[in-house]
Amino acid sequence: MNLHEFQAKHLFTEAGIAIPRGYVARSSAEARAAAERLGGSAWVVKAQVHAGGRGKAGGVRVIQEGDEIERYADSLLGERLVTHQTDGRGQPIHALLVEEGLEIARELYLGALVDRASQRVVFMVSAAGGMDIEEVAASEPERIHTVRVHPAAGLQPYQCRQLGFALGLDKAQVGDLTRMMQGLYRLFLERDLSLVEINPLIVTGEGRLLALDAKVTVDDNAVEIGRQSQIQDMRDLTQEDETEVRAAEHNLNYITLDGNIGCMVNGAGLAMATMDVIKLHGGAPANFLDVGGGTNAERVAEAFKIILSSPSVEGILVNIFGGIVRCDMIAEGIVAAVQDVGVEVPVVVRLEGTNVEQGKQILADSGLDLIPADDLADAAAKIVDIAGQVA
């Protein structure tokens, strides 16, 4: 679960991390009032969307006149911002963050994430702040410095100093960085975060360290079990894929992709393998969809509806392994779902597991135009061929 910048900075404030003064605005009048409240001669106005690259896309601007703030706010609010991290439709803008203008001496990068390989929280810094850190890692990896935090010992002051010295900070700034990193680490643990980024972390003209930007991702599992109820209230569904939100309401794990072959599979591992085999046969999956272990007719019907909501889908591959549930029950669910939904694209079905022969017989006796497959390779070859003919 992602947070808006202003929400992330609210958490930063609770953790004692210094941020610029600023206010959230949801109208042009509120934006101007925020600037007047801040005072000064320059302000930074930022579109609040769940995407990076806002500056290059016109979603961040330094403004020096109140009238211009209103005009700029009017041009953003209610519109959609398209960046290199969004799809072609972009993300809707419902709020702006208006902050004080600051003199910037240096732009740095500070981030923390869960490294699955080492099973540690890893802190990263770079003197290449304000840039896409992935690009820096690819082109100049020597500019990124990291420390791994032992879960029993926690983040140690010497590790913070190590990164501060790597950035060339002076003694006072190293102390600021140490306090900032320790606050971030506490926040990371207390709020069940999986990622936090400050890009850029700036050194002001006065030599202070400030979090000029903020990106926070919360572990979805912690939110779903209710451990982070306060953060759950911060969720902005308008920033999420509508189909994925709908799928989650029915306990379906769905991710939109760019292909034309819809996939319905039980089990995340089998779903990924199914997509791999489709690609191997020259096709392109339109989605990842895990219907889960307790598959029933209602869930299968909803899965079909969600898959078919994409106009790009020209065929569907159903790949089910009957372990927890029997294949005959799954087949009955597929037949009922296809009859209920009125599926008009070709459907290839591969069943394997308990009572598989009974399941295949149910499909054969249904009178529906369901195409059986003997194994996954056969299923992938058939759906790729059929979808290609439809296209």
Swiss-Prot record:
Per the UniProt entry, the Enzyme Commission number(s) are: 6.2.1.5
Tell me how the cofactor is bound: Binds 1 Mg(2+) ion per subunit.
Query: One GO molecular function term?
Result: succinate-CoA ligase (GDP-forming) activity
State the function annotated in the UniProt record: Succinyl-CoA synthetase functions in the citric acid cycle (TCA), coupling the hydrolysis of succinyl-CoA to the synthesis of either ATP or GTP and thus represents the only step of substrate-level phosphorylation in the TCA. The beta subunit provides nucleotide specificity of the enzyme and binds the substrate succinate, while the binding sites for coenzyme A and phosphate are found in the alpha subunit.
Name the HAMAP family on file: Succ_CoA_beta (MF_00558)
Gene symbol of the encoding locus:
sucC
- UniProt GO BP: succinyl-CoA metabolic process; tricarboxylic acid cycle
Reaction it catalyzes: succinate + ATP + CoA = succinyl-CoA + ADP + phosphate; GTP + succinate + CoA = succinyl-CoA + GDP + phosphate
The residues that hold ATP are: K46, G53, R54, G55, E99, L102, E107
Its pathway is: Carbohydrate metabolism; tricarboxylic acid cycle; succinate from succinyl-CoA (ligase route): step 1/1
Query: Which enzyme type, at the first EC level?
Result: ligase
What name has this protein been given in UniProt? Succinate--CoA ligase [ADP-forming] subunit beta
PROSITE patterns assigned: ATP_GRASP (PS50975), SUCCINYL_COA_LIG_3 (PS01217)
The prosthetic group or cofactor this protein requires is: Mg(2+)
Pfam families reported for this sequence: ATP-grasp_2 (PF08442), Ligase_CoA (PF00549)
UniProt-annotated binding residues for Mg(2+): N199, D213
Keyword Lipid metabolism found: no
| Species in which this protein is naturally found | Halorhodospira halophila (strain DSM 244 / SL1) (Ectothiorhodospira halophila (strain DSM 244 / SL1))
> What keyword terms does UniProt attach to this protein?
ATP-binding, Ligase, Magnesium, Metal-binding, Nucleotide-binding, Tricarboxylic acid cycle
